[in-house]
């Protein structure tokens, strides 16, 4: 369980009902560098989506050296069981990119999942998280700062025993089929195997590909702390507009967002 640390202020306008609408809206606001007003604005919107979905919402604040303060916005869904699954998406973008696919797409899927949790009926406790300060090219730090704080919190909440997996949704709004990535030598049956099985049940096309080095998304920090993590994102087509001005809302596609959401929902149902 995670205590609610701070209630998120409500965004003024209604939250769109689908991942594509949320991702389009967030990326239409322009770049969202770590610790900026843009990042905070996106996270307020996601916090509202979490609350509208009936989740307990908390904020985990942390310092971004030389930039200010960022945060992780955490929506908690409790079950009678002690096991835990985490689904996260980073909120920031690397200027000058408006960050539609990287990573308003992931935020959109996380927000849509929040509204579907009662229908999904997850088997384990779930933390849905909009992480902050992921873009190392902007923070200048070797770690994804929000993910590091989140992984430490998971570890403090008995993550070594409770956590089944922490999945980063990163660039899930354009290229498809997806790659499922992790820094391990071979797929683990309870992590990559379980996620791939869930994908197969709902027709989401996924191929596991080993990470280069320790990984380049928020799952990295979980693995470095000895907790199981993986990333769902772009496949062989890559992301040609990553960190560029051309990563605009018009590039987002509905199909990959729907397929990502279906896969994760099925994975959350698994025993």
Walk through the language-model features, giving the residues of each.
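Sec-dependent N-terminal signal peptides
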Residues: 2-10
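N-terminal capping segment at the start of a domain
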Residues: 10-40, 53, 92, 165, ...
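Second-shell loop/turn segments in exported
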Residues: 13, 27-40, 61-64, 94-103, ...
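A non-catalytic alpha/beta surface segment that caps or lines the substrate-entry region
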Residues: 22-78
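Sec/Tat-exported extracytoplasmic proteins
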Residues: 23-34, 50-54, 77, 98, ...
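Structural recognition of the beta-strand scaffold that forms the well-ordered cores
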Residues: 59, 74, 85-88, 127-130, ...
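Acidic/histidine-rich catalytic neighborhood of metal-dependent amide-processing enzymes
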Residues: 94-194, 198, 211, 215, ...
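Active-site-adjacent substrate-binding region
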Residues: 172-271
């Amino acid at each position: 369980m995670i205590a609610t640390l701070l209630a998120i202020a409500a965004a003024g306008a209604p939250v769109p009902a689908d991942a594509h609408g949320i991702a389009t809206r967030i990326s239409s606001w322009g770049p969202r560098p770590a610790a900026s007003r843009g990042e905070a604005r996106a996270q307020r919107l996601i916090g509202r989506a979490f609350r509208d979905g009936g989740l307990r919402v908390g904020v985990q604040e942390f310092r971004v050296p030389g930039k200010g303060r960022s945060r992780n916005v955490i929506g908690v869904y409790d079950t009678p069981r002690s096991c835990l699954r985490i689904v996260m998406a980073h909120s920031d973008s690397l200027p000058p990119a408006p960050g539609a696919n990287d990573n308003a797409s992931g935020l959109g899927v996380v927000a849509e999942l929040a509204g579907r949790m009662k229908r999904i009926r997850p088997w384990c406790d779930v933390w849905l998280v909009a992480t902050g300060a992921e873009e190392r090219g902007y923070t200048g730090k070797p770690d994804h700062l929000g993910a590091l704080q989140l992984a430490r919190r998971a570890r403090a909440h008995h993550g070594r025993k409770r956590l089944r997996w922490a999945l980063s949704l990163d660039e899930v709004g354009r290229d498809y089929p997806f790659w499922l990535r992790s820094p391990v030598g071979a797929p683990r049956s309870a992590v990559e195997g379980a996620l791939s099985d869930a994908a197969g049940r709902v027709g989401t096309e996924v191929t596991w590909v080993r990470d280069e080095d320790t990984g380049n998304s928020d799952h990295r920090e979980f693995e470095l702390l000895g907790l199981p993590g993986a990333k769902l994102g772009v496949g062989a087509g890559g992301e040609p507009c990553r960190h560029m001005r051309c990563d605009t809302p018009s590039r987002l596609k509905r199909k990959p967002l729907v397929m990502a959401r279906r896969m994760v929902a099925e994975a959350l149902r698994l025993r």
